[in-house]
Amino acid sequence: MLRRWAQTVEALGYDMLTISDHVVVTPDVAEQYPAPFYEPFTTLAWLAGVTERVALGTSVLIVPYRHPLLVARMAANLNQFSGGRLVLGVGVGWARQEFDALGVPFEQRGRLTDEHLGAMRTAWADEDDYQSGPIPIWVGGNTDLGMRRAVRLGDAWHPLRMTLPWLRSAVDRLKAIAQALERPVPALVPRIVLRLTDLPVTGPERRVGEGTIEQVLQDLEELRLLGSETVVLDPFDEDPAETLAPDRAWQALEIVADRWTWTNSTNQGEPQ
């Protein structure tokens, strides 16, 4: 299944393949994600061997779950062995039962994330030892705290599954936070749901990437206008069974790839 995912994504012309992160499939995790759940660094290392050009990313790695120097080492090795293809999307986590199972204090996950990211960057600065090369860090979190963390510690802000009005407002807040902290505005790299429908989806709760192919293409254009040069498409729509039978997801990715390429070729006069 993983090999087919990798080959499908690369053949369709996409630029990245991402994997999420859970160490223990506790009951709160199992409600959304089925077992087995693959460890991200091991899986991405294997995927590096069956792909040629796509970037390999986490969306997202739960930073407090692992010792930061171990993460720094694994990430550096993976980035080196894959030819510089690793992108590290990170988050603080949400599954309290999983934190309890790992013996990590849930209430301190934000502080731990900040400390761990700082330690990882310090480790990577030792180029003689880690030899990582540049590893982009995308900081997730649909909150002001997440935005502040992205401004202080990340290369990009990586919000997940949102509505367009919310994102427009959030981008303004992100810029204000960066200005207040006197730091550059991080890149905008959203992960959006991909759920194609035959009829238009309307209403204020419509998420970016949800609706007809025309709506999805318009959403991608709106994201471009907001400054996003990279968008992660997430065809998993909260039904664990879909991950075991991903034909619908592959079909949706193919439709978007075909139409997006055609649209850009028509508008710009050259294929993308």
Mark where each language-model region is.
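Active-site-adjacent structural elements that line small-molecule/cofactor binding pockets in enzymes
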Residues: 1-272
